[in-house]
């Protein structure tokens, strides 16, 4: 009986510590130090309504927008409840057909030359919000033409939204597609 009582006391104690105190302290510190990130890194539009998160990719298919990495989520694209890769190998005929269709779509939309991998292959999560600067540059001509802008104007906005490697050596340069498209919309609506 004594063993059951001590086990029960330890269970209740650790439940309170690990299930209540620790999460509350970590959440409080996160909200104090990184308030935007702790709340989901939401991005707001010009009317101050939340339009997405800078951490989760979103579908853009209109020619006036930069297109993100393809989504590999099931049921429908960019389904954050079903995050994950396709698990198709590089020799899978269905996968190769899908990649070829994506390359054709980009060439039909005006992209010239070789297409960066980030525009035809989904990321491991299937929800990557970023593309490489090269993947963005290949879309500049299309976006500029549809928006009635010069390529140089679009390039300047792209350069302003290109993030370099963290600490100068971690990761790769990247462009958040949602933030870039919102910047283009905000410029257009001035």
Swiss-Prot record:
Keywords: ATP-binding, Cell inner membrane, Cell membrane, Ion transport, Membrane, Nucleotide-binding, Potassium, Potassium transport, Transmembrane, Transmembrane helix, Transport. Its main location: membrane. The chain crosses the membrane at residues 9-29. It is found in: Cell inner membrane. It is a single-pass membrane protein. GO terms for molecular function: ATP binding; P-type potassium transmembrane transporter activity. InterPro entries: KdpC. Pfam families: KdpC. GO terms for cellular component: plasma membrane. The keyword Transmembrane helix applies. Part of the high-affinity ATP-driven potassium transport (or Kdp) system, which catalyzes the hydrolysis of ATP coupled with the electrogenic transport of potassium into the cytoplasm. This subunit acts as a catalytic chaperone that increases the ATP-binding affinity of the ATP-hydrolyzing subunit KdpB by the formation of a transient KdpB/KdpC/ATP ternary complex. Belongs to the KdpC family. HAMAP family: KdpC. The system is composed of three essential subunits: KdpA, KdpB and KdpC. This is Potassium-transporting ATPase KdpC subunit. It comes from Citrifermentans bemidjiense (strain ATCC BAA-1014 / DSM 16622 / JCM 12645 / Bem).
